[in-house]
């Protein structure tokens, strides 16, 4: 029987976010949870079991960005046994089918649910918790953000102990956890007004693995971890914006119970610029021009990220006018298109004039009339009409 599409199994489309995928999994998994079929017929139990396995298989693939990418490209063939470059098929053994119910019910499971015990399978449910994610703020210049740059960062993290290879045991020797008898979880009961409520939580001694060291590692004292400094080259793509993150899977902190490392998130912080203000892919700047250039028009030099550029200022330019310089902004992070530079013109009033300059300016002013001042002329006409209406 051909496998159903994983997106169809969870009732979502390919554009679904990580949060949407998790919500869809919760809904589907709870619908076919074993506790809901405790009194059902054998046929109904078998059908629910198959659907439940199918739901968890779909979630394991779609919740992992790398596996999701492989599935989107190759479909189910990406995970078939012997598939080239993908290392075998789906393995439910290492997947925590109950973790989603712990999210909902505070770690207590759903009615004592452990693995596939509701379907007659093994009751052992080990819980492998990943290491913590790390965040690193990387400060770069606007020019580096525009053109892309390679940076080397150093950060401290909790890594795996080299002596015990992360097991916490001297010579890697482990034994069954006596607290949980190798189950990885402990169960407690509490009397409430609704009756006896049963909950399940991760074993505090083995952290869900079901194993503890026969003898604690002398280097890490049984934690399986050690502090270390990591050096990493970070390739910052051209067009990246302030606050955007670069994710490096597995470069976060090590797990204390043999689980996968957390992830490293490099958060980009762009330094403020002396000339430009960025808005998306556009750059804004103010360029002061002389009074005569504003009146007569001309060319002015402006800065760009690629060097100097001359732009034309039209005759009679007002202060505050915006001039667009196409294609001199930031390249799109998606790889197509480029923003513009938006130049805001400001007219600088000359100061510290000599008597001769003042005299020449006065004569020039006297030579002008209403036709030379369209806005002033229009305003004065409105003022005259305003007072005329009051008097009438």
Swiss-Prot record:
Cofactor note: Binds 2 Zn(2+) ions per monomer.
Name the UniProt record assigns to this protein: Chaperone protein DnaJ
Gene name, Swiss-Prot/TrEMBL: dnaJ
Record PROSITE patterns: DNAJ_1 (PS00636), DNAJ_2 (PS50076), ZF_CR (PS51188)
Biological classification of the source: Bacteria, Fusobacteriati, Fusobacteriota, Fusobacteriia, Fusobacteriales
Organism (species): Fusobacterium nucleatum subsp. nucleatum (strain ATCC 25586 / DSM 15643 / BCRC 10681 / CIP 101130 / JCM 8532 / KCTC 2640 / LMG 13131 / VPI 4355)
Renumbered ranges of CXXCXGXG motif repeats: 161-168, 177-184, 203-210, 217-224
Gene Ontology MF annotations: ATP binding; heat shock protein binding; unfolded protein binding; zinc ion binding
Family in the record: Belongs to the DnaJ family.
Domain remark in the UniProt entry: The J domain is necessary and sufficient to stimulate DnaK ATPase activity. Zinc center 1 plays an important role in the autonomous, DnaK-independent chaperone activity of DnaJ. Zinc center 2 is essential for interaction with DnaK and for DnaJ activity.
